[in-house]
C-alpha cells in the first residue's frame, strides 16, 4: 500500500488514510461525496471529509 510505511506499519507522512470507502490516493475524500448509494428507502451515505470511513446516515428518503 503506497500510503503506508511497511517498516513501521503506520500511515506515511503526508497521508491521511490508507484504505476505506472515503479514502482516495491516501487522502480523505471531500465532505458530501457519496460513498454508499441509496438502497430502498435509505438516503445516500456520504463522506465526512474527516475520516476514511463511510458512516451510515440512518435517514430514510
From Swiss-Prot:
A motif (Cell attachment site) lies at residues 39-41. Expressed by the venom gland. One of its GO terms (cellular component) is plasma membrane. Keywords: Cell adhesion impairing toxin, Disulfide bond, Hemostasis impairing toxin, Platelet aggregation inhibiting toxin, Secreted, Toxin. It is found in: Secreted. It holds the Pfam family Disintegrin. GO terms for molecular function: toxin activity. Disulfide bonds join 3-26, 17-23, 22-47, 35-54. Its main location: secreted. PROSITE patterns: DISINTEGRIN_1, DISINTEGRIN_2. InterPro entries: Disintegrin_CS (IPR018358), Disintegrin_dom (IPR001762), Disintegrin_dom_sf (IPR036436). Residues 1-61 form the Disintegrin domain. Belongs to the venom metalloproteinase (M12B) family. P-II subfamily. P-IIa sub-subfamily. The disintegrin belongs to the medium disintegrin subfamily. Inhibits fibrinogen interaction with platelets. Acts by binding to alpha-IIb/beta-3 (ITGA2B/ITGB3) on the platelet surface and inhibits aggregation induced by ADP, thrombin, platelet-activating factor and collagen. Monomer (disintegrin). This is Disintegrin viridistatin. It comes from Crotalus viridis viridis.
Amino acid at each position: 500500500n503506497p500510503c503506508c510505511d511497511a517498516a513501521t506499519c503506520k500511515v506515511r507522512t503526508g497521508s491521511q488514510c490508507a484504505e476505506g470507502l472515503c479514502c482516495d490516493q491516501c487522502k480523505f475524500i471531500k465532505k458530501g461525496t457519496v460513498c454508499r448509494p441509496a438502497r430502498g428507502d435509505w438516503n445516500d451515505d456520504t463522506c465526512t471529509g474527516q475520516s476514511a470511513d463511510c458512516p451510515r446516515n440512518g435517514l430514510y428518503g
